[in-house]
């Protein structure tokens, strides 16, 4: 046995391998000579579903599809209308549409900006305006979405970023010294006050020692230069004195040789006379 729960009714218990009779129309629609348990009744019910609900499937025999004519279809349609099957189908469709609306409303509750849509839906239900719905191919009516253009116009426009002037950036490239100073500044900003003071005093001492060293080096250089100048002056003096002495000696030798030559010539003349 299978148990089926029905809405607003007690549970329905049916034997296994049998369909529930609650899904079929009333027994009066079948006319005389028909019963709910017969196979022909089930096939006729499937024929009705195929004709009016667009169901495509192999639930009825191919023989009836081939033998069925338009006149038979019209007769079956008239019988179904007379028995109230159409009213039952429309009632089911209204319930399904109501459930769809409830599901759609529950989804739109958490979506921002859905107040306009909900108010539009309520006004459509009250006024029953056919222009606010969109007809689909299966006969259903879907409410059109209403967009509030006034709120859209009040929204602020996005600000555009100013274009970057690459030429100026390329012209004003920082030197290596500036880059080092900027890096040092960023590093010192992350230090504490005590650490900054220690670094400051260290840099001051380093700069002072460097200045003193440069001054002492300059003084030593000047002293060395002075000594070299004095030594060069002495050498120049000595070289000039030696050169004078040499020149005087050469001149004296020349003079002595001249005197000797003259004296020798005078002696020879004197011998000739005697």
From Swiss-Prot:
Expression is induced as follows: Repressed by members of the TOC1/PRR1 family of clock genes.
Keywords assigned by UniProt, alphabetized? Activator, Transcription, Transcription regulation
Q: Does the keyword Transcription regulation apply?
A: yes
Q: Which GO terms describe its biological process?
A: circadian rhythm; regulation of DNA-templated transcription
Residue stretches spanning the membrane: none
Keyword Transmembrane attributed: no
Q: What is this protein called?
A: Protein LNK4
Q: Which organism is it from?
A: Arabidopsis thaliana (Mouse-ear cress)
* Gene name of the record: LNK4
């Amino acid at each position: 046995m299978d148990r089926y729960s029905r809405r607003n009714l007690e549970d329905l218990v049916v034997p296994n391998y049998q369909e529930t009779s609650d899904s079929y129309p009333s027994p009066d629609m079948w006319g005389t000579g028909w019963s709910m348990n017969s196979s022909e009744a089930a096939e006729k019910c499937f024929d009705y579903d195929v004709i009016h609900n667009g169901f495509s499937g192999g639930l009825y025999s191919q023989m009836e599809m081939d033998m069925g004519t338009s006149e038979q279809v019209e007769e079956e349609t008239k019988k179904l209308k007379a028995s109230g099957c159409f009213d039952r189908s429309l009632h089911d469709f209204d319930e399904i549409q109501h459930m769809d609306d409830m599901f759609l409303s529950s989804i739109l509750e958490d979506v921002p900006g859905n107040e306009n849509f909900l108010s539009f839906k309520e006004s459509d239900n009250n006024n029953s305006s056919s222009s606010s719905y969109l007809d689909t191919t299966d006969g259903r009516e879907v409410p059109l979405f209403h967009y509030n253009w006034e709120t859209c116009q009040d929204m602020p426009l996005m600000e555009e970023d100013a274009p970057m002037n690459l030429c100026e950036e390329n012209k004003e490239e920082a030197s290596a010294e500036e880059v080092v100073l900027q890096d040092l500044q960023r590093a010192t900003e992350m230090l504490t006050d005590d650490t900054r003071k220690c670094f400051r005093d260290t840099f001051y001492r380093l700069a002072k020692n460097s200045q003193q060293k440069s001054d002492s080096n300059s003084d030593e250089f000047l002293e060395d230069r002075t000594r070299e100048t004095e030594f060069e002056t002495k050498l120049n003096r000595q070289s000039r004195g030696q050169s004078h002495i040499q020149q005087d000696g050469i001149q004296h030798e020349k003079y002595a040789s001249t005197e000797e030559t003259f004296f020798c010539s005078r002696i020879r003349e004197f011998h000739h006379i005697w």
